Amino acid sequence: MQSEITLKSPIFALYVLNDFVIVASGGGNAKFGVKNTLQCFQLSSSGISASPVSEQQMGNDVPVYISGLPSKNIFCISVNNFSIFYSISKKGDFSEIYKIQSLPTANEDLFQSCLAVTPTMLCTGASNGNLKVFSLKFQNNDISAVDLLKENTSAHIRTINSIIVIPEKKILITASGDGTCKMFEIATLKMLKKISFRASIEESSNYFMRDIQYDSYNNVLYTLQSALRGKSFITKWDMYKGLSPISTIEVNDIVCSAMDYNKNTGVIGVVDCEGHLIYIDTKGEMKKIKKLTLGENMIKCGAFYGNQFISGSVDNILRMSKSYTSGLISIGFLFKIILIGLVVFHIYNKKNNIF
């Protein structure tokens, strides 16, 4: 197992699915030597498998976004105007990915930019801001039925970068390059709320919404927004109060590309266009914990695996970064050690009548 793997082409998307990371790389026409591939690597606390456990050649198609269903070991990718479902099958000591179904989920002249999948639905976003919701039915890890439920052709005026589905609230939330983040009712795709961000009232335009993450326990939404060639911020929004802003933190003075939220620790990992990984503690007032320099080139995507962070960069490198607490003893753990020591010392003294 290794902490760093060099692939043959730039990494555009990744998704952590149980003890695997699915990696989409490529970015060009296969006829000119740039292979577009979908690879599956094994993960453990000690690192990433040195070679993929399974691989799919994508020809001229560039996978740009991945979402998944960990409970079913199923994931879905955005390729051109298609959504393609795959499953990870374990046979003895070996695992492999195999294609379940390919669905034309965007119009022929559009590029599908992102998607989100749940056990009952698929939501897709396109390069022109088009938003669609499909119903899904699974049978024995295969898709038995797909139906278009609703389409909103004017959800956004620019590319939709990210979608989050919250089934229990019957809503979905989108982030777009048009500078807005919107909440929609799933059944009708009627817009319920729109939010945007500017660092100061003097600025003339909204920041691009790069990514969104949802904390279901605290009912909080996090948005990552950046200027075209400038600063990046994360804002915490209160879902109980209709997406009212709670606090904002400046992450960096350059463009950040993606983030992921660790629900176990309340920490966000953010990656930027100059090879940095920044950890943000979201408990209470947001604050930066640590900034790591992983390389010199843009890190395009990232996700937590436990407390470790998996990232993929445009210089072909797949990395596992240790937890920000790696090698440190927490105050709580130190207190437990001291307490146990005092108890043992007390028992020893009592037996030997030292005092």
What are these regions (language model features)?
Residues 22-25, 30-31, 75-79, 122-126, ...:
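Conserved beta-strand element within WD40/beta-propeller blades
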Residues 278-329:
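Juxtamembrane amphipathic/hinge helix adjacent to a transmembrane helix
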Residues 33-35, 39-42, 83-88, 131-136, ...:
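WD40-repeat beta-propellers
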Residues 1-4, 20-56, 80-95, 138:
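Beta-propeller domains
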Residues 8-13, 59-70, 107-114, 158-163, ...:
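Repeated scaffold domains used in trafficking and secretory/extracellular systems
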Residues 325-355:
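C-terminal single-pass membrane-anchor helix
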Residues 16-19, 66-72, 114-120, 163-170, ...:
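Loop/turn segments within WD40 beta-propeller blades
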Residues 1-5, 51-57, 96-106, 144-153, ...:
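A short beta-strand motif characteristic of beta-propeller blades
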